[in-house]
C-alpha cells in the first residue's frame, strides 16, 4: 500500500481500513503499509527512487492512494503539486510495477466546513487547506490515469458522494481523514475492487501458508 496519511492512519486502530485488510489476509499474504503522512506524489516518488529497499520489488498487488496532499491549497500550499505533475507522477509510480496487478484509490471528497473548523482549532488561519472542487479534479485525474493504464480503480470520491446524502461529516474525523465509519467504507471498497478486478488475489482465493491444526 503506497500512500499518505489516509493510508498510514489505516493502522491506527483495529477498525482502520489497513488493519482490516491485513486481518482478512492473515496467513495468506502480508499487507505492507507504506503510507507517509504529509507526503504528495512528488515526495513519494522521490522516496521510492532513493530508498527502493523500503518497497517490495515483486508484490502480489500494489495499491496507490495519493492525491489528498497534492490538492492542498491556502496555508498548506507547500504540499501542493500541480495537476499535470500529479498525473505524471502517478504514471511513473505505477510504471515502477509494470508487471504487477495495481489499483489506484482516488482521493476522497473534502468537507470544507470541517477543514475550516480544523484550521481554526489548530492554526492561526480560518480558511480550509483543501477544497472540494479542487480535490475532485485530482480524483478525476487519478481515475483517468488508471483507466488509461489498464489498472484497477477504487473510486473513493464517487463512493463517498453516493453515501453521504448531502452531509459526509460522519465519514470523516476532520473533513479530510476518515472516521471509523469512513474507514469501513474504504475497506469495503478496496475488497470489492480486488474481487472485481483481480479475483484470483481475493483473500478467500489464496492458500494458507501452512496447514490448519
Annotate each predicted stretch with a short phrase.
Residues 15, 19-30, 43-213:
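Alpha-helical cap/lid subdomain in secreted, periplasmic
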Residues 4, 36, 176:
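Conserved donor-binding loops in enzymes that form glycosidic bonds
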Residues 1-12, 39, 71:
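Catalytic nucleophile-elbow at a beta strand-turn-alpha helix junction centered on a G-D-S/GDSL motif
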Residues 3-4, 33, 66:
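Short glycine-centered, acidic/aromatic-flanked micro-motifs in structured strand/loop junctions
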Residues 33-40:
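Short beta->alpha junction loops
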Amino acid at each position: 500500500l503506497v500512500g499518505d496519511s489516509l493510508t498510514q492512519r489505516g493502522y491506527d486502530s483495529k477498525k482502520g481500513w489497513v488493519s482490516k485488510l491485513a486481518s482478512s489476509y492473515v496467513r495468506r499474504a502480508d499487507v505492507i503499509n507504506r503510507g507517509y503522512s504529509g507526503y504528495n506524489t512528488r515526495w513519494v516518488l522521490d522516496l521510492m527512487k532513493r530508498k527502493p529497499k523500503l518497497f517490495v520489488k515483486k508484490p502480489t498487488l500494489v495499491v496507490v492512494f495519493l492525491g489528498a496532499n497534492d490538492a492542498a491549497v491556502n496555508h498548506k500550499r507547500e504540499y501542493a503539486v500541480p495537476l499535470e505533475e500529479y498525473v505524471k507522477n502517478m504514471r511513473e509510480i505505477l510504471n515502477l510495477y509494470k508487471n504487477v496487478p495495481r489499483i489506484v484509490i482516488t482521493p476522497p471528497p473534502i468537507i470544507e466546513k470541517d477543514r475550516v473548523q480544523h484550521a481554526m482549532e489548530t492554526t492561526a488561519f480560518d480558511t480550509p487547506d483543501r477544497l472540494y472542487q479542487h480535490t475532485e479534479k485530482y480524483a478525476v485525474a487519478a481515475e483517468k490515469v488508471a483507466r488509461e493504464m489498464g489498472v484497477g480503480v477504487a473510486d473513493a470520491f464517487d463512493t463517498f458522494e453516493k453515501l453521504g446524502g448531502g452531509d459526509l461529516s460522519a465519514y470523516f474525523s476532520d473533513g479530510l481523514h476518515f472516521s471509523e465509519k469512513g474507514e469501513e467504507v474504504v475497506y469495503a471498497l478496496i475488497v470489492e475492487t480486488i474481487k472485481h478486478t483481480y479475483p484470483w488475489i481475493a483473500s478467500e482465493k489464496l492458500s494458507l501458508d501452512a496447514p490448519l491444526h
